[in-house]
């Protein structure tokens, strides 16, 4: 089985950049599950990638010792549809793991046990631990014992001060929590770019993710400043739709996203359109 490695050709997030490395990933998993896998543990990274748009489809997935396949998603907004998303992800991961020849053979094959984890650090209220079930999404709810298909996702709140035992077991996770917390605090009194820059500098001076931020500081800054997600797109689209009632702008916004436009770039784009139309 191949060694863990990060494919830097594909767009990622600060979270996946930090925890995509084998040692950091094992530290994170050990912190969450209170296990003690060492650096000699056999890890195979199975994160899904979109070759067309050169970006990752899911955040992190990996196989431990050939026994467990773990999928970890990091989110800043709650998504009740995660069980279905995880189902689609795990099906593709199993396709990577299992040979098609074996799949149609007469001998039973074995597959790693799946585990599904979401780490949440958004601003909405969220309990320390929450369980999401695929069966809760069925149009006709059934008793748990009658569900023919089930998938369970465990959501952990990793905001500063929540699930603190995780941070005590992982310096990297503790540092990540502090870093994000500082950005949230600084952005209250300054623009986002300045807040990110200040948080990076303060963390380096205070020995919080020091080596990581010294090596990847500019990359982290750019990721956080221009890192778009679907929630950002939806917020901008809703704002534009309220202003002029033309929901067809959604497609234009999504096209601009694919070209790497930031939220500020897109808002400026539409302002210029409005000014041109009024001349």
Where are these regions (language model features)?
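Accessory alpha/beta interaction modules
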Residues: 1-166
